[in-house]
Amino acid sequence: MSMMCGGISAPLDADEDIQKMCDNVKPHAEEKAGKKYDVFTAKTYTTQIVSGTNYFIKIHVGGDDHVHLRVYKKLPCHGGGLELSGMQHSKSLQDPIAYF
């Protein structure tokens, strides 16, 4: 399946690398949300290639609650760091991941 340049990929199941990325930005997500998460499990994600990579990740945060994160991973030549650049609250498992 081809992807439009700058478009987002088809959803994929989260793996260990995506979970590590989420664990890394969890404190920033908690600060943004104004609360602590006992559960913070990556479920699915999509990517968008820009001058780096945007990861749009569905996170289970307990009960039926989910959040969507946009995590930007810089190119290695720019340090390769991670940045939480967006967060959507009040999501469900069924809500599709879309650009935000």
Swiss-Prot record:
GO MF annotations, alphabetized: cysteine-type endopeptidase inhibitor activity
Biological process terms from the Gene Ontology for this record are: cellular response to bacterial lipoprotein; immune system process
Annotated Cystatin domain ranges read: 6-88
Instruction: Supply the Pfam families for this chain.
Output: Cystatin
Give the keywords, sorted: Cytoplasm, Immunity, Protease inhibitor, Thiol protease inhibitor
Q: In which tissues is it expressed?
A: Widely expressed. Highly expressed in liver and to a lesser extent in spleen, gill, brain, intestine, kidney, head kidney and blood. Lowest level in muscle.
Q: What induces or represses this gene?
A: By bacterial infection. E.tarda bacteria causes significant up-regulation in head kidney between 12 hours and 24 hours post-infection and in spleen between 24 hours and 48 hours post-infection.
Name the family the entry cites: Belongs to the cystatin family.
Q: What is this protein called?
A: Cystatin-B
**What is the native source organism of this protein?**
Oplegnathus fasciatus
